[in-house]
Amino acid sequence: MRHYEIVFIVHPDQSEQVPAMIERYKGIVTARGGVIHRVEDWGRRQMAYMIQKLAKAHYVCLNIECDGETLAEIETGFKFNDAVLRHLTVKMKKAETAPSPMMKAVQKEDAAKSHRAEAPAA
């Protein structure tokens, strides 16, 4: 089995369905004997360019270990799901389990927001 990193972008109006989508794709991988190494929900972020007249979208990253048939099934699911705007699959040399640089940035932004919310207004 090979290691893959999959990033997919979900329509911002469908953000509440993202946890269910993640569970569905995780279920496909595990049902076929694959392994989930990392799941990251990067949240709603600004896109580099407009897609379908949208400036923001919900980003999700999965690091998995599976065979080609499982990967094909996941990618077919992306193609027939109207909520998925784009997806990218990259073959990796080894399993990635540490937080990605993007996730570290998301955590840093969340920490800054919570710090600002706790600070009293002057």
Curated annotation (Swiss-Prot):
Domain of life per record: Bacteria
The biased composition feature labelled Basic and acidic residues covers: 106-122
Task: List, alphabetically, the Pfam families matched.
Answer: Ribosomal_S6
Q: Name one GO molecular function term.
A: small ribosomal subunit rRNA binding
- Keywords for this protein: Ribonucleoprotein, Ribosomal protein, RNA-binding, rRNA-binding
* Gene Ontology CC entries for this record: cytosolic small ribosomal subunit
Q: Where is this region: Disordered?
A: 97-122
Q: Which GO terms describe its biological process?
A: translation
The record's InterPro entries line, in alphabetical order, gives: Ribosomal_bS6, Ribosomal_bS6_sf, Ribosomal_S6_plastid/chlpt, Transl_elong_EF1B/ribsomal_bS6
The entry assigns this protein to a family as follows: Belongs to the bacterial ribosomal protein bS6 family.
Q: What does this protein do?
A: Binds together with bS18 to 16S ribosomal RNA.
Q: Know the name of this protein? A: Small ribosomal subunit protein bS6
